């Protein structure tokens, strides 16, 4: 889906279009905790509801037409060549996936450690995802109005600082949900900007190859993030979760600056 959307999107509108796409994806993340709040976490009901939602989401595919996209110059692009062209974007998705998957996996455990109830933790996760739904639309518009790499840097730094502040704010009754809402929007835009920048740089089969590699980085991040953060929490305690996630983005930042200089 990202390949086709990126190929067909005009660059002047790319930020807004990918913002809508990202909001739709974030809506799915927001829906998950809400389903658990309504169904509970015991028994088969949450699995049945999830299966129904997946089936409903697939229905529009029956009405899609088979549209060809333009070809690139190389019919057999090298993934290594693609990586060398945009290592910062590929490693961005690795870092993003590692961070967001670790957060989703361990936030309930972190919440218990700081005294949150299960329902409160799930509602904050839903609020975090809702921020990705709502804020990617204005941030996507902003991506069409300013330098996209600058906006990416702002999102990464803001997200890193947000996780450093999370333990001090998240348990507050009013500001906690507002904080997680903004944090979810800023972090969600990191992924969207990665997709936008790939579409800005590549076309045709090169875009397809870049998107495949980008997705592969996501998969690697989803495996590495929870494993590394979980190991860190075993050593440092459950309260270390947000600091370990912030460290993931801190490790990425030098890669961003080195790539921008070359």
Where are these regions (language model features)?
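A late C-terminal transmembrane helix in Major Facilitator Superfamily
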Residues: 205-234
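Helix-loop-helix hairpin linking two adjacent transmembrane segments in secondary transporters
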Residues: 21-62
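Intracellular juxtamembrane helix-capping segments at the cytosolic ends
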Residues: 1-9, 189-202
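Helix-to-loop junctions at the C-terminal end of transmembrane segments
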Residues: 40, 135-147, 233-234
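A membrane-interface helix-boundary motif in multi-pass transporters
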Residues: 38-52, 231-249
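Structural signature of the two symmetry-related core transmembrane helices
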Residues: 150-165, 246
């Amino acid at each position: 889906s990202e390949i086709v959307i990126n190929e067909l999107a005009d660059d002047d509108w790319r930020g807004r279009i990918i913002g809508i796409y990202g909001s739709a994806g974030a809506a799915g993340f927001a829906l998950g905790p809400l389903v658990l709040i309504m169904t509970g976490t015991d028994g088969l009901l949450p699995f049945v509801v999830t299966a129904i939602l997946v089936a409903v989401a697939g229905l529009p595919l029956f009405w899609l037409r088979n549209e060809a996209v333009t070809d690139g110059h190389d019919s057999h692009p090298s993934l290594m060549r693609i990586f060398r062209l945009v290592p910062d974007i590929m490693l961005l998705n690795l870092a993003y996936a590692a961070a967001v998957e670790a957060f989703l996996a361990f936030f309930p455990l972190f919440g218990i450690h700081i005294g949150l109830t299960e329902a409160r933790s799930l509602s904050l996760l839903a609020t975090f995802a809702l921020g990705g739904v709502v804020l990617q639309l204005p941030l996507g518009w902003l991506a069409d109005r300013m330098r996209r790499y600058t906006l990416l840097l702002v999102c990464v730094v803001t997200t890193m600082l947000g996780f450093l502040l999370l333990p001090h704010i998240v348990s507050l009754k009013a500001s906690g949900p507002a904080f997680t809402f903004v944090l979810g929007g800023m972090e969600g835009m990191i992924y969207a900007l990665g997709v936008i920048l790939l579409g800005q740089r590549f076309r045709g089969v090169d875009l397809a190859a870049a998107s495949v590699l980008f997705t592969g980085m996501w998969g690697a991040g989803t495996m590495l993030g929870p494993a590394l953060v979980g190991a860190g929490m075993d050593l440092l305690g459950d309260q270390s979760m947000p600091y370990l996630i912030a460290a993931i983005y801190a490790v990425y930042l030098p890669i961003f600056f080195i790539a921008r200089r070359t």
